[in-house]
Amino acid sequence: GTPSTEITEFIQNNPLAKERKLHSTWCTNEKTAMEVALGMSYAGKRALVCMKHVGMNVAADAFVNSAITGVNGGLVVLAADDPSMHSSQNEQDSRFYGKFAMIPMLEPSSQQEAYDMMDYAYTLSEKLKLPVLMRVVTRLAHSRAGVEVADIREENQLNPDHERAHWVLLPGNARKQYLDLVKKQEKLEEASSKSPYNYLEGLNPEYDYEFGVIACGIGYNYVKEADTDSCHIPVLKVSQYPLPAEEIRTMADRCGYVLVVEAVSYTHLRAH
């Protein structure tokens, strides 16, 4: 459903995708789509599954359990949120699904970043052996721009994991693998703290500021449009989760007031 429909339509109509025999299909529902993509990942291939935010509700069973089984080939779950409900019955925030499943999340702020993040997401997924949730919003999903493209990489060959017991979440397996997932959270936090998509701008740690901004995803673009050279406001850009706690503490310590700009409903994530 919109605003995610256009992604699959573009892939199916793209000449390069056809030339490379990229397999793209519609599924009965989001849970089925999630399971198909997860199966491709188990076989060693990279897979992308796209849905809108309310589709995450339907896919939740397979989505949450995929974090416990883990992945083989890189798996990216793209959730297209719809703030202000342009074509949806609610405006839920899919980032909470990523937090609930305890997996990495990415939120691009521009078309170029969305392009670059996809390769980064697959690499991160294969490194951590976890699915990666990428959140986009309507204003980004319904936009186009020229981007600087990277070289085309060789596709993953079929390489199924020969040890398959962990794919079956009987309690004996699930308990152990859930603990493994909990232990991975430090690696997720480390990846977020070192992420090229989370960074501070215009903040000198030796000075105190009256005002600072934390901008998430496309909110960063809105801040930069409103900013001028005379403002001198420090900005923390956040596009990878878990939240970069150390950078947030720096902002809180150095700024009297901190404004958070994000495309989100009334609830919000907190750094403790």
Regions from the PLM with identified roles:
Residues 209-212, 216-225:
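Long hydrophobic segments that form regular secondary structure
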Residues 1, 214-218, 238-240, 261-264:
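Structural motif
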Residues 267-272:
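Conserved small/polar residues in nucleotide/adenosyl-binding loops
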Residues 1-111, 118, 137-139, 232:
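Thiamine diphosphate
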Residues 82-83, 137-142, 217-219, 265:
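Glycine-rich beta-alpha junction loops
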